[in-house]
Design a protein with these regions (language model features):
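Symmetry-related core transmembrane helices of the 12-TM Major Facilitator Superfamily/SLC fold
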Residues: 180-198, 396-412
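Cytoplasmic helix-loop-helix junction between adjacent transmembrane helices
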Residues: 118-158
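C-terminal transmembrane helical hairpin of 12-TM major facilitator-type secondary transporters
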Residues: 297-345
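Helix-to-loop junctions at the C-terminal end of transmembrane segments
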Residues: 75-87, 172, 281-295, 388
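Residue-level signature of mid-helix packing/kink "hotspots" within the transmembrane helices
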Residues: 69-77, 161-162, 276-284, 377-378
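Helix-loop boundary and gating motifs at the non-cytosolic
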Residues: 8-70, 224-272
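Hydrophobic core of transmembrane alpha-helices in multi-pass small-molecule transporters
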Residues: 30, 102, 113-128, 324-344
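Structural signature of the two symmetry-related core transmembrane helices
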Residues: 90-105, 298-313, 401
């Protein structure tokens, strides 16, 4: 490497908030994320095959996602405690354990209840790892580079969401769901090997003092309390549609537009990929714009608004397309682009949270923040499954948008109050 090349590479790494620790985290998150995306987007379709009823599949889906959110609440808090007391390396290693157990259950079982139990375990790698990633970014990356560092992490999480659904759709349509699980289980093995190799460069955690939860709650900044309360509304609306959108689109294309099932499955996979490609295109430019802005609040508010718009768009856009003689897939593609644009403010929101807590308690505080959020909205998918069966998916999705708009309005009011106080 020449002298001229070295500063250029160092500058690029610094510009992106990259160093050894953050690169190790990116690799681990990327592998585990790809593993999840290969199977999770097709879980509702697999349950539909197993139960033989779209309503039963919706009920199981609601139960699974409610249990997942409840367990995630504990996972975030436990992950924060591990990262605080034992360090990020151990927290990242432990995050792969429940996923591995879940895969073994899913591969061995055929009962919808066993599938539900295994899938809940499989989705809980992220809450165990999130406090560690915040701790690493907060301690290893300068404050003026944290938004871009979170944007790079978001890209690394989104890349699997682009590749995974395409791989999963091909596997599910060609062979069956067991192939999705087998591919995903293999990716977990790759993640564990890379994790052991890459994270040995991370410094061990020094001695830390225990921090009571009541102290963290008492010292949580007012702005973060307001953000948390608004997020609860947003996540309630989001979870009314998140686990059900693939099932909704599949049923729409097959029953109303008479698509072949295999073609509809491929469409679901590619629509998810469109969402994630859209999000990928926004992360870096928006993150740099946020870094240069006086406040991240407008970007967060726009994100919340787009969260609220997606469910009602999923209901209305296909009808508009039919009325104007356009292919339904064009309307669905536009809707999923809107769904991808809602990630505009995610790096800004994460940077706001990371900057809001002092370094000594950051990992534990982030775990508590995420945990409280998960506890608050964990019933949402269960309620959505109930409403789907009682009043239908269209009405359920409209209710989701109303809840999201309530959260957006509350954040707009509370952020103005926070701006006046700052």
């Amino acid at each position: 490497m020449t002298t001229a090349q070295k500063p250029l590479k160092e500058t690029a790494a610094q510009w992106l908030g990259l160093n050894r620790a953050t690169v190790a985290v990116l690799v681990v998150i990327g592998c585990l994320g790809l593993s999840e995306e290969v199977w999770s987007n097709f879980l509702a379709l697999h349950l539909n095959d197993r139960t033989g009823s779209i309503l039963r599949a919706a009920e199981y889906t609601g139960l699974i996602y409610s249990a997942t959110n409840l367990l995630e609440g504990f996972g975030y808090i436990i992950g924060g405690r591990i990262a605080h007391s034992m360090g990020a390396r151990l927290a990242l290693a432990i995050s792969a354990v429940p996923m591995s157990i879940g895969f073994m259950i899913m591969l061995a079982a055929d009962s919808p209840w066993a599938i539900a139990f295994g899938s809940v375990l499989m989705t809980n790698w992220e809450p165990l790892s999130v406090p560690a990633t915040f701790d690493i970014v907060g301690s290893e990356v300068p404050k003026n580079r944290r938004t871009i560092a979170f944007a790079v992490q978001s890209i690394q999480k989104r890349l699997p969401k682009v590749i995974g659904p395409a791989i999963g759709a091909a596997a599910f349509a060609a062979i069956g769901y067991w192939l999705n699980l087998t591919i995903a289980f293999g990716l977990v093995g790759v993640a564990v090997v890379l994790q052991l190799f890459l994270t040995n460069r991370m410094q061990p955690k020094g001695k830390t003092s225990p921090v009571p939860f009541r102290t963290i709650m008492r010292d949580m900044p007012r702005e973060l309390r307001m953000l948390l309360s608004a997020e609860v509304f947003i996540r309630w609306g989001d979870w009314f549609v998140r686990g059900f959108s693939g099932l909704y689109v599949l049923n729409l294309l097959i029953t109303e537009y008479h698509w072949e099932k295999s073609s509809a499955i491929y469409a679901v996979g590619w629509l998810v990929a469109i969402t994630n490609l859209t999000a990928l295109a926004t992360y870096i430019p928006i993150a740099k714009l946020v870094d240069r802005s006086k406040s991240p609040r407008p970007f967060i508010g726009l994100t919340f608004l787009l969260f609220a718009v997606f469910p009602v768009s999923l209901v209305m856009m296909p009808r508009f397309a039919t009325a104007f003689g356009l292919p339904v897939i064009v309307a669905l593609g536009f809707t999923y682009v809107v769904n991808g644009l809602r990630e505009l403010g995610e790096p800004a929101r994460k940077a706001l949270i990371a900057n809001g807590f002092p370094p000594a308690v950051r990992a534990r505080a982030v775990g508590l923040y995420w945990g409280l959020r998960s506890f608050a909205f964990f019933p949402a998918p269960l309620v959505a499954g109930y409403l789907w069966a009682r009043i239908g998916p269209d009405a359920t999705f409209v209710i989701a948008s109303v809840i999201g708009l309530m959260g957006t309005a509350w954040y707009a009011v509370s952020s103005k109050a926070a701006a006046r106080l700052s």
